[in-house]
Structure formats: C-alpha cells, structure tokens
Swiss-Prot record:
GO terms for cellular component: cytoplasm. Residues 45-142 form the THUMP domain. The keyword Flavoprotein does not apply. This is Ribosomal RNA large subunit methyltransferase K/L. The gene is rlmL. Specifically methylates the guanine in position 2445 (m2G2445) and the guanine in position 2069 (m7G2069) of 23S rRNA. It comes from Hahella chejuensis (strain KCTC 2396). Signal peptide: none annotated. It catalyses: guanosine(2445) in 23S rRNA + S-adenosyl-L-methionine = N(2)-methylguanosine(2445) in 23S rRNA + S-adenosyl-L-homocysteine + H(+); guanosine(2069) in 23S rRNA + S-adenosyl-L-methionine = N(2)-methylguanosine(2069) in 23S rRNA + S-adenosyl-L-homocysteine + H(+). Belongs to the methyltransferase superfamily. RlmKL family.
C-alpha cells in the first residue's frame, strides 16, 4: 500500500513531543497544531504508531478535507472518498461527529450528510449498503467540523491512553499518555538508558511507575491491549501487522532482560498501593517495580548501583482556597525532603498551583505547560544538586507550623502578635470577649480579624483592580495560615467572610449549612454569635460603645430598637433597667435570635419582639418611647418590603417618624454605616442634633474611623 496521511491527536501542550515521537516510529511529520500532529506514513508506520505511541490519543487515517462549510460542500467532499476501500458491503460502521462549522451547526446533521454520501457510493456500484450501528460498528468514521472539515478512519477504535492495565484508579487519576509525556519532559528516556533510578513518592494507583517501567524496558504500550479496528479494514495486511507486532515483542523481551536500573513507588494510602500492585501485575511489571506503603517524607529508596536518579510526582493540587491552604505545609515538607534526601537527583513536580510550587523552595530549571484534561498545569523540573540551600543561621521559630513562610508573611505574623498582646490586655479590662485584633494594619494584608472567645472571623476587603489577583490570593492564604498559629487556635475555628457584590439579596444571606455557635461577653451581657452560617456574626462589634451608653442611660426608660437585628442593644437596655423594650425587625430568624439572647441573660418582663416592615410599623405605631435606637441598613430590597430602602434618600422621613414617637426629653440614636452618608440639613434645623461619631467608635476600631456615623437627636427646647 502506498503512503497516506494520518492525524494523531494528543492532550494540549504535547504536540511537539508527539511529533518527535512519531518521527522515531517512522513517520514523516507534515504539520502540528494544538490538537495533534499530521504525518505521512506507510502501512507499517501506521501499525507501529498504534502499537507504540505513548503520547497519542486517537489515530486517524485522513480521507478528505474541505473548507466549504455547507451541506453540499460536505457531501461533495465525502463523495470523493473511495468508501468501498475502507468499508465492506453490508458491514456495520459508525460516524463519530464533533463540532460545528458554517451552515452545519449540529454534528448529527453533518453525520447524516456523510452517511448519505457513503450510501450513494455503494448504491452507485450496486453494492449492499453498509449499516449504521454504534454498538457493533466494525469501523468508525470520524467527522471533525471546524474551520477545516476533515474526514478520517479511526485506526485504533479507542484512545491510545487506554493501555489496559488500569481498570481502577485512585483519586484524581493521571491519564497514561500524560504520565508518559511528563516522563519524556523530565528526561527519563535518557536517564533510564544509563540504568538510572526512578521514584514516585506519591504514586497513587501507580500510573507514573508503570509508564516509567515501560519506557525503561522499551515495551510498546499497545502490547498490553493489542486489538485495533484496522485489523478489520479491507486494506489490512496481516503479514505486515505480524511483522510489526513481533518486532515490538522482541524489543520488550530484550528490554526486560537488559534493564539494570530501579523503579520505586510509595504512597501513604494502603488502598492506593494495593491498586498500584494490581495495575503492575496486569502490565506484567510487578517483578521490576518496588512498591511500599509509606510517607513521601520518610521513604528512602535503595539506589545503590544506579546511574542518574529521577524523582517525579503529582502531588494534590488543591483547587479550592481551603485545600490549597492545607497543602502548603505538604509542599514545603516535600521541598525539605528533596534537599535532605535527594541531594544529587533530578526532580519533576507536576501541579496546577503556582503558589504551591513556590512553597517547594527550589528554583526550577525548566517549566513545561501542560493540561490535565481541561486543567492548566505545569511540570517544574529541578536539579536538586544545584539547588542545595545556603547554610542558615540557627533561629527559633515562633511556631513550628509556620516554618518556611515568606518574609512578608513573617512581617504580618509579627504585627498580629503585637496586636494580640495589646488588644487582649485591653479587652480583659473592658470585660470583653469579642473584639477586633487586626484591621488592615499592613496595607498588603487588607483584612479585618475579629476574635470571638476562641473563634476567629477573617473579613477580606476587596482589593483594588490594580492589585494582581494571584498576589491577593497568595496574601489571603498567608493570613489564613498565620492567624490560627499566632492566636493559638485550631484552623477549624477560623471563618473567612468575603463580601461580594450580590444581586437581589441582602448581604446577610446564609453562607454555610453548619452551625458554629458560641457565646461572648460584653460589659456584663452575653450574646449568642454564629461564626459560620452568615456573613455577619450576630453582633456588630463597632456598635459596642453605643450599646454600653444605652445600658447606662436606660433605667426606667421605654426603649425602642428599630432594625433590631439580633437584639443586642435591647439586651443592654433591659440589663440597664429599661421599663420596657420593643424590638422590631422583618426577619423572624433574627427576632428568634434576639429572644434567645434575652433568655441567655435571664431577662424577663415587658419585652416585645415585633416582626414587621419598620417603615410601615413606624407609621402605624402610637406609643411613646424615651430612648430609640435606629440603625438601618444602607440598602434593602427584601421581598417582604413593597419599597426599596435607600438610607441616603429615605433617612429624613425615617427620623421624622421616629421623632413623632419620641417622648419629650427622650433621645433618638441614629447610626449609619454608609461611608458617603450626608445628614439632611432639614433634620438639623428642626431638631437638636449632636454628632456622637467619635465617642461611638470603640478603641479597637479607631483604625477605621469611617466605619459608621452616629448622632443623638432630641426635640428642640
């Protein structure tokens, strides 16, 4: 048979490695693209690629191509193929169609056009029509609809990464051809040729060690699963195929006989090692690979007599923020282990996380960008011998778990330690067990850290657009790692809150299904707080002085708390001897919370909890009050409200409605946390207004004096 064109597809990023491999298998490479490599081969070359390629996915014999993306254009192109050369009369086949192009917007429509052309080809020659059958199709025609439409015959009938030895896998499996590509890029073919040594200290189900052994012993991967669709093609030549197959078998036998190197794998998970052993057994390689259940940090391979040494591993990536935080210590430990136990080795670390790769603490000699499925990943290659660390001066770390953090993170740790000493001493004198420890003291670490008697809330301030997103993420990871260690708590007691722009809902939405409740103390009162389930804890710490003022001035007073939230101000009023308290909010959740706070403080008496729209309730209420606390949200568009509340626009009317209920000699405390808020000048003209903002901001919030504004409003004399 004459030479023909074929196309070998591969994972993105492997095109040039595949092109080099195809050349060694006897192909003439014509061109590469991000999807694979086009080459010219003879029949033996096509067989050799299907049997011996470690990197390819699908191998297609190219039949036709066109750029005319119409029904007629596709039909014409398909009609020019001599289909009786590739399909037998009456034989079953399938058309695998992918993509869309021009007028051909659906792949199945494209497949139907090709089917029509095939049927017409056989009909014109008075031959029995082949039959479309996906399950039992003897051959597979592949139609790729793109800028250039191509038709091809699938030579293998499967992706070549399916070697046959892996019938089960550990978590996050690595495809066989990607594993082989990693080994190629890491230089294993050259190292193993000198009887080198290979170690995967996190081997999982063993894909890397199996592929390493097959490369070392020159075992064609197709020998493990030597069944291909081309064997049923009309043009198949059994004699040529037998010659290619026997040649590959001879190389494998000779490779096993000559191999003098060593291959090791270990994993901490016994189940993964059991799976790896079964995979090795199916590959017929269990005699040549040593597996052990052990930690990567403890495993020491016996490499006596080996030439060059290579370590490659695929550690966990940690796609979520919390996972990445937990994995930092693993990558640091891996870096330390490389320096201490693998000092004359070459190493390759395959990961999707740039941040985690930095934690290894070694300078990469080379980086290769690859894809693990859709996930962008990088293979970092290190010459560990050339990366030996400089001698370090002895130092005693403040906390062993923080060894290896960056210099900037060290500065954050030092600042947080100083703040803790200062504010914990202050809080003890104030009878407080909930207070702010850190509030963007270092601009690089723009977070607020609040202490709730053994629990922590970290609130991230949105970084400006000028700040690189990856740098901001790295700094946040620093905060999440350093904070529990400095404050002496378990990481499970830290809760991250990220205020993001929301549509159609209040900022108080539930964020977690768990309940992490605890009680905290404030000036003799106790409160339930929930650190996990909502963006806010249930206690606004910046209003602490106002609540304490209410406690000291509420004796015998009728107290009204509007937009009461969890009723903390009402608790202080009742504790201060208020004659009555009335707490109004639209949320039954928060009203129930307020009642629990009253029960916690053993407060009983004439205390009302009213579920209502505050705007409507104010207009309908006729009772008088001596002390009113008005702390509305900046903006509210709850479904329970007919109108949208905009505090800048609506505050004058709200205040006037409150003043109608305020008894002579009474005080309305109006607070607002809208940073650009301006008090209506008409309010200052009609009533006696005192700005109490400075006095209302507690010491632990002085770093952010714009956190709220506060006024005391009375009737004019």
């Amino acid at each position: 048979m004459n030479e023909f064109s074929l196309f070998a597809s591969c994972p993105k990023g492997l095109e040039y490695v595949l092109a080099d491999e195809l050349k060694t298998l006897g192909a003439e490479v014509l061109r590469t693209n991000p999807a694979g490599v086009e080459a010219k081969v003879d029949l033996a070359g096509a067989y050799r690629i299907c049997l011996g390629s470690r990197l390819a996915n699908r191998v297609l014999r190219l039949l036709q191509s066109t750029r005319t993306a119409t029904r007629d254009g596709l039909y014409q192109a398909a009609s020019e193929v001599n289909w009786s050369e590739h399909l037998r009369p009456g034989e079953s086949y399938w058309i695998a169609a992918f993509g869309s192009s021009g007028d051909i917007r659906h792949s199945r429509f494209g497949a139907q056009v090709v089917k029509d052309a095939i049927n017409d080809h056989f009909r014109d020659r008075d031959l029995e029509l082949p039959v479309i059958d996906k399950r039992s199709g003897v051959q597979t025609v592949q139609l790729n609809l793109a800028k250039t439409i191509t038709l091809g015959l699938d030579l293998a009938g499967r992706s070549l990464h399916q070697r046959g030895y892996r019938q089960e896998g550990a978590a996050a499996p690595l495809k066989e051809n990607l594993a082989a590509a990693i080994l190629y890029r890491a230089g294993w073919p050259e190292i193993c040729g000198e009887d080198g040594c290979f170690v995967d200290p996190m081997c999982g189900s063993g894909t890397l060690v199996v592929e390493a052994a097959m490369i070392a012993m020159n075992i064609a991967p197709g020998l493990l699963n030597p069944h291909f669709l081309f064997e049923k093609a009309p043009w198949h030549d059994p004699e040529v195929w037998r010659g290619v197959y026997e040649e590959a078998m001879e190389k494998a036998v000779l490779g096993k006989r000559r191999w003098r190197g060593a291959i090791f794998g270990c994993d901490l998970n016994p189940a993964a090692i059991r799976t790896a052993k079964r995979n090795l057994s199916r590959a017929g390689l269990d005699r040549w690979v040593k597996l052990e259940t052990a930690s990567a940090m403890d495993f020491t391979p016996d490499t006596e007599g080996c030439g060059q040494r290579l370590l490659v591993c695929n550690p966990p990536y940690g796609e979520r923020l919390g996972q990445e935080l937990e994995l930092r210590s693993l990558y640091r430990a891996l870096g330390r282990r490389l320096k201490t136990a693998y000092g004359e080795w070459k190493a390759g670390i395959f990961t999707s996380s740039v941040n985690l790769a930095k934690e290894i603490g070694l300078r990469a000699d080379k980086q290769y960008h690859l894809y693990n499925g859709p996930l962008a990943t990088t293979l970092y290659l290190f010459d560990v011998y050339g990366n030996r660390p400089e001698a370090e001066t002895p130092r005693k770390p403040q906390n062993a778990s923080l060894e290896g953090i960056s210099e900037q993170a060290q500065m954050f740790r030092n600042r947080l330690s100083k703040n803790l000493a200062k504010w914990s001493k202050w809080a003890k004198k104030q009878q407080l067990s909930a207070y702010r420890i850190y509030d963007a003291d270092m601009p690089e670490y723009a977070v607020a850290i609040d202490w709730y008697d053994g629990g922590i809330i970290v609130q991230e301030y949105a970084p400006p657009k000028s700040v690189d997103e990856e740098k901001a993420r790295q700094r946040l990871l620093d905060v999440l790692e350093v904070t529990p260690a400095v404050l002496g708590i378990d990481g499970g007691q830290l809760f991250l809150k990220q205020r993001k722009k929301q549509k159609g809902m209040l900022q108080y939405e539930k964020t977690d299904s768990s309940r992490k409740e605890r009680t905290v103390e404030e000036h003799g009162c106790r409160f339930w707080v929930n650190l996990s389930d909502y963006l806010d804890s249930g206690l606004f710490l910046d209003h602490r002085p106002t609540r304490y003022w209410i406690q000291k001035h509420s004796s015998g007073k009728r107290f009204l708390n509007l937009f009461c939230y969890t009723g903390a101000a009402s608790v202080h009023a009742a504790a201060g001897g208020a004659a009555t308290t009335t707490s109004v909010d639209m949320s039954q959740t928060y009203l129930s919370w307020a009642e629990r706070n009253f029960h916690l403080n053993k407060l009983s008496g004439p205390h009302r909890f009213v579920r209502a729209n505050v705007l409507d309730w104010l207009k309908a209420e006729h009772n008088s009050y001596d002390l009113i606390f008005l702390d509305p949200p900046t903006f509210s568009n709850s479904k329970k409200m007919e109108d949208v509340l905009d505090i800048q626009r609506d505050h004058a009317g709200l205040i006037e409605d409150c003043m109608r209920l305020l008894a002579p000699g009474g005080v309305l405390i109006f607070s607002c946390n809208y940073r650009r808020f301006k008090l209506d000048s008409g309010i200052e003209q009609r009533f006696a207004v005192e700005n109490h903002t400075a006095a209302s901001i507690p010491e632990d919030f002085k770093r952010n004096e714009r956190i709220h504004q506060c006024w005391h409003i009375r009737h004019s004399a």
